[in-house]
Structure formats: C-alpha cells, structure tokens
C-alpha cells in the first residue's frame, strides 16, 4: 500500500512542509499551522480516502534537545544566549502544536533527530528528489525528513 508521507521542519513562523504522494515529492512549501490544517482538510484526507493510502508524518524532533543553548563562543553576550534559547523554545512549542493537530486527525507521527541534511546542499536534494521548483533551507529539511519516511 502506498502512503502519503509528510515531512516537517518545525519553526515558529512557518514550517517547512514536504508532501510525497506515492513516493514522489509533489508539494514543497513553507506553511503556518492554519495553512497546513487547510491542506490536510482539503487535499490530504481526500487523496488518502480516494487512493486508500495511509498518511504518515516525519518530523524533526526539536523537543529532543535542551533549550539551554550553549553558544559556540563562550564569551557570547548573555542577551544573545537568551534570544537563542527563546527561539528554540518557540520552535519546541510549534512542534507540540503540530503534534496536537496530527493527533486530532489520527495521523501517525514519527520523530527524527535534528539533522542539517539537505539544508545547505541544494544540489544533493535536487538530485535525489528530482525537484525543479523553488526551495529554501527549511523546505529542503522537511523534504529530507519525508525522504527518511520513504526509506522505512
């Protein structure tokens, strides 16, 4: 049975989202929570029912790291450290909200360790996925987590 695989890179402003239908990357976008919910309601559920496909989400587990962030430069200003910790906390809350959304729809969520794969390496991303459209670091990261779901 084929699946709809959703890759997610959680963020406080807009999540990187990648959708694989039947093993092929079809949607790559940045979306906020409401946009993602609309996509689930208007597309994923219908496609899942029409094709008898399961939906599975593969997400970067930002909750798996400590919010007490140590800067590379130990002499970094305390305000910089606090701002970084705040951003990590916001991303963690975003992940919690995403998981609640998927739980509401009874969609299976698989968490993956944080990875920088494909964030910077656009050429490798395009070679593996055959994606020719626009992408950014967050959407490529989401595509990577979705790709991990294809390989399971």
Name the predicted role of every residue range:
Residues 2-152:
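Phosphate- and other anionic-substrate recognition elements at nucleic-acid/protein interfaces
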């Amino acid at each position: 049975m084929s699946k709809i695989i959703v890759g997610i890179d959680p963020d406080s402003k807009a999540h990187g989202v990648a959708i694989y239908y039947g093993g092929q990357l079809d949607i790559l976008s940045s979306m906020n929570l409401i946009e993602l919910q609309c996509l689930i309601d208007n597309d994923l559920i219908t496609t899942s029912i029409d094709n008898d496909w399961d939906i599975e989400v593969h997400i970067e587990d930002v909750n798996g790291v400590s919010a007490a962030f140590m800067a590379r430069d130990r002499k970094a200003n305390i305000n910089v450290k606090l701002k970084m910790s705040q951003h990590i906390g916001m991303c963690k809350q975003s992940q919690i909200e995403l998981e609640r959304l998927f739980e509401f729809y009874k969609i299976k969520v698989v968490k993956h360790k944080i990875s920088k794969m494909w964030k910077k390496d656009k050429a490798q991303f395009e070679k593996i996925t055959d994606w020719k459209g626009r992408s950014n670091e967050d959407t490529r990261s989401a595509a990577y987590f979705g790709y991990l779901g294809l390989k399971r």
